[in-house]
């Protein structure tokens, strides 16, 4: 079986009830969220306590001093999370059916991403033009 989701992808769109689950979760901005997430990973034992948070990419704007339209950015993060949430639900339904049919234990599940980072996020950076790479 092959399942291909178009989410998460621009344009960002999700069900209102899914977006509502994430209302307020991103209000503090990405810099604080990064710090909280690494601390939570330490507490859970997922990473070593001595591992440090990498510096924010120098091309990514500082949330506190450089983001002009925070409400827009917050909404983008809420909708993006809602898209992932709906995808997760769908994958869960597939897993449930595999278990019901008794074939889960004989199934390999691969999660693949074809796009890498979102190219539309250039507005979140100091970059104004696409960067062209050559080998």
Describe the residue ranges of each PLM region.
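Active-site His/acidic residue clusters
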Residues: 1-36, 46, 54-79, 115-124
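Conserved acidic, metal-coordinating active-site core of Asp-based
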Residues: 41
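Conserved small/polar residues in nucleotide/adenosyl-binding loops
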Residues: 125-131
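Metal-dependent active-site segment of extracytoplasmic phospho-/sulfohydrolases and closely related
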Residues: 47, 51-57, 86-123
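Catalytic-adjacent loop/helix segments of enzymes that bind and process anionic phosphate/sulfate esters
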Residues: 78-82, 86
């Amino acid at each position: 079986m092959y399942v291909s989701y178009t989410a998460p992808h621009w344009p960002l769109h999700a069900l209102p009830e899914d977006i509502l689950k994430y209302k307020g979760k991103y209000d503090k901005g990405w810099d604080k969220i990064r710090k909280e997430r690494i601390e939570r990973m330490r507490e859970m034992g997922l990473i070593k306590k001595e591992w440090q948070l990498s510096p924010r990419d120098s091309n990514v704007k500082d949330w506190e001093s450089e983001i002009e339209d925070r409400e827009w950015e917050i909404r983008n993060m809420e909708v993006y999370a809602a898209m992932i949430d709906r995808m997760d639900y769908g994958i869960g339904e597939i897993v449930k059916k595999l278990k019901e049919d008794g074939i889960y234990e004989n199934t390999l599940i691969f999660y693949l991403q074809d796009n890498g980072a979102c190219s539309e996020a250039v507005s979140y950076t100091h970059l104004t033009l696409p960067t062209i790479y050559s080998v």
